[in-house]
Amino acid sequence: MTNIRVLIVDDMAQVRSDLRTVLPLAGQAAGLQIEIVGEAGNGQEAIQRISALQPDVVLMDLEMPVMGGYEATRQIKTHCPDCRVIALTIHGDETVRQKASQAGVDDFIVKGAPINSLIQAMAKEKE
């Protein structure tokens, strides 16, 4: 079974909690072992934790206080170019997608999409 280490970055505690609960179960059903190695409530916290946690995948909200996902992604990609950053956002318009891509986001999932979409995006890390 493929192991994927995940850092969840979102300012909403409920979103982090839901992902922490659902991802390992959905991953297991897809033949993946998803390990939630940590959480952060904003981009600055994520950057502070990235070296110690060494995730394969960072699930990144784009709009957060203190430091948003765009700037956090740019900094994460500088220090950890092999980390796969997947944006999780309520904004699915093309302008947001382009801005995320320019920041270094590897994949883009609109919140509320089927969990399988997120699992597939995470599985790309290990292909």
Question: What does each of the following model-derived ranges do?
Answer:
Residues 1-5, 30-33, 116-127:
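Non-catalytic signal-transmission and effector/linker regions of two-component phosphorelay proteins
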Residues 9-10, 40, 58:
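Conserved sequence signature across two-component system core domains
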Residues 13-38:
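Two-component/phosphorelay signaling modules centered on CheY-like receiver
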Residues 42-45, 68-71:
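Acidic catalytic/metal-coordinating carboxylates
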Residues 52-59:
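Active-site beta3 strand of CheY-like receiver
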Residues 61, 89:
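Active-site residues of response regulator receiver
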Residues 64:
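Receiver (REC) domain active-site loop signature in two-component systems and cognate sites
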Residues 71, 92-109, 113, 117-120:
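Alpha4 helix (beta4-alpha4-beta5 surface) of REC/receiver domains from two-component response regulators
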